[in-house]
Regions:
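A short hydrophobic beta-strand element within the catalytic core of glycosyltransferases
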Residues: 32, 51-52
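Aromatic "clamp/platform" in nucleotide-sugar-dependent glycosyltransferases that forms part
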Residues: 37, 56
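An anion/phosphate-binding loop that grips the pyrophosphate of nucleotide cofactors and donors
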Residues: 48
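Short glycine/serine-rich donor-binding loops of glycosyltransferases
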Residues: 61-65
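Short hydrophobic beta-strand element within catalytic cores of glycosyltransferases
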Residues: 69, 73-77
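A conserved nucleotide-sugar
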Residues: 1-33, 142
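A charged, aromatic-enriched C-terminal amphipathic alpha-helix characteristic of glycosyltransferases
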Residues: 112-143
């Protein structure tokens, strides 16, 4: 529903051509980007809010560990080993329940907005601003 969301698809697989056709058919080229095989995944993590791995068959995917280490919310399919979870921001979802995935992504968006609001409220809190102004006057007086 959110037009600001970008889905970055990293890597290649046997369904890539089918997926590209479906994206064009649904007119989602602005929201879904096929990046192919990359060597700069570390940098791409910095641009992400959430990492999604809806895999049908997966052992212990290193990419899931990397995403958690980068402090991302992570959504893994319930087909992936539970040993992968090393972060409280990681969740296992039913691979066959699209609504469960959609709801969790919406929940994460809401959490991020709330966190941003709390940061901004603190940043512009009158007490915090007063302390900063006072520190500047004290430092200015020392010069």
């Amino acid at each position: 529903d959110n037009k600001n969301i970008k889905l970055l698809l990293i890597g290649i697989g046997k369904y890539k051509n089918d997926m590209e056709k479906k994206v064009k058919e649904l007119n989602l080229e602005k929201n879904i980007v096929f990046l192919g095989t990359r060597n700069d995944v570390d940098e791409l993590y910095q641009a992400m809010d959430c990492f999604i791995l809806p895999s049908l068959y997966e052992g212990l995917p290193l990419v899931g560990v990397e995403a958690q280490i980068n402090n991302l919310y992570c959504l893994f399919s319930n087909t992936i080993t539970k040993e992968l979870k090393i972060s409280e921001k990681s969740y296992y979802l039913n691979i066959n329940n699209l609504n469960e995935w959609k709801n969790k992504i919406s929940e994460i968006q809401l959490l991020d907005r709330q966190k941003l609001y709390e940061i901004n409220v603190k940043k512009f809190d009158i007490t915090e601003i007063s302390k900063k102004i006072q520190e500047r006057y004290i430092n200015y007086g020392k010069k």
